Regions:
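Short, Lys/Arg-rich, polar N-terminal cytosolic tail immediately upstream
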Residues: 1-21
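Alpha-helical transmembrane segments in multi-pass membrane proteins
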Residues: 27-74, 92-97, 243-245
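Membrane interfacial helix motifs at helix-loop boundaries and amphipathic/re-entrant anchors
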Residues: 39-55, 110-136, 185-186, 224-244
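Juxtamembrane helix-loop-helix connectors linking adjacent transmembrane helices
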Residues: 51, 80-151, 158-159, 163, ...
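Alpha-helical transmembrane segments and their helix-entry boundary regions
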Residues: 52, 83, 93-94, 156, ...
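Hydrophobic residues within alpha-helical transmembrane segments
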Residues: 99, 173-177, 189, 213, ...
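Membrane-interface helix/loop boundary segments of multi-pass membrane proteins
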Residues: 148-173, 200-207
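C-terminal membrane module of polytopic membrane proteins
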Residues: 216-269
Length: 269
């Protein structure tokens, strides 16, 4: 039981996290390094026709394997599933995920405009999303990245950093790694901001499940709107950019606020 006079350590500051569920920061660094190294090798060696799915699979297979092996060799509190961040958090984190995932994609459109992105880079990204069917695009570029990338960058890295570091510092470091992993100027700033917000949720929730939802929804909305699958919505956004921007900012701020608010203080009886 926590005393009101107990010093605010990092674990108390983040509160809500199940003690011992995240992996040790040094182990997390090793897992992320091994995962990204394997990812680069696969991206170079695998045929382009399957490189997206193969490279994404690495982001899930390597961390899962590493955590399972480490738990067998060095028993630690909690299960491997909890260590990966695959535990159910309070419902408010899923509400936050919906609020953030549904609107952050629109805010990031304005951030992309600030970057030195060439027309060719924009065209390549657009063709990548437009070429497959809508269902295939949603699976390849929304569902799969949401699960695989969140597992390593939020389930492993962000939660591990959240143990010794303050919330904003841990979220900032993990977001920077996530942004660098993209290897794309066009995606650098949007993924940095998205990664920071998702890390806040993952650390507070001690779970990657809500961030998977937010990530999948963010990507799905970007894909659907980029392909003009919802012409009425696209037309409204084009005619009311200020209202859309204000609404998106408010929704994202709401999601962040309910994610980072401190839980009720435990009073000794």
């Amino acid at each position: 039981m926590t005393s009101p006079n107990e010093p605010r350590t990092a674990s108390l500051y983040h509160a809500g996290a199940a003690a011992g569920s995240a992996v040790d920061p040094s182990l997390a660094a090793a897992i992320v390094t091994a995962t990204l190294a394997t990812y680069l090798v696969v991206a170079v060696l695998v045929p382009r026709s399957v490189v997206v799915m193969a490279a994404q699979a690495v982001l899930a297979v390597v961390p899962i394997t590493a955590v399972v092996i480490s738990r067998r060799r060095m028993p630690a509190p909690g299960t491997a599933r909890a260590a990966l961040g695959l535990r159910l958090p309070p419902r408010r984190f899923f509400v936050a995920a919906l609020a953030i995932g549904a609107t952050t994609w629109y805010l990031n459109m304005y951030l992309v405009a600030l970057l030195p992105v060439t027309e060719r880079q924009v065209r390549v990204l657009a063709e990548l999303v437009d070429r497959p069917s809508l269902a295939a695009a949603l699976v390849m570029f929304a569902l799969v990245p949401a699960v695989c990338e969140e597992l390593v960058f939020r389930g492993i890295l962000a939660r591990a950093l959240g143990r010794p570091l303050r919330l904003a510092v841990a979220a900032g470091i993990s977001a920077a790694v996530f942004s660098a992993y993209q290897l794309s100027i066009a995606q650098a700033l949007p993924t940095l901001t998205l990664g920071f917000v998702l890390a806040l949720i993952a650390i507070r929730a001690d779970s990657a499940l809500p961030t998977m939802l937010a990530h999948a929804l963010n990507n799905a909305m970007a894909i659907v709107m980029s392909r003009d699958e919802l012409p009425a919505a696209s037309d409204w956004l084009a005619r009311h950019p200020a209202a859309a921007l204000l609404g998106g900012a408010a929704s994202t701020a709401f999601g962040i606020a309910i994610s980072v608010r401190r839980p009720d203080r435990i009073v000794p009886t």
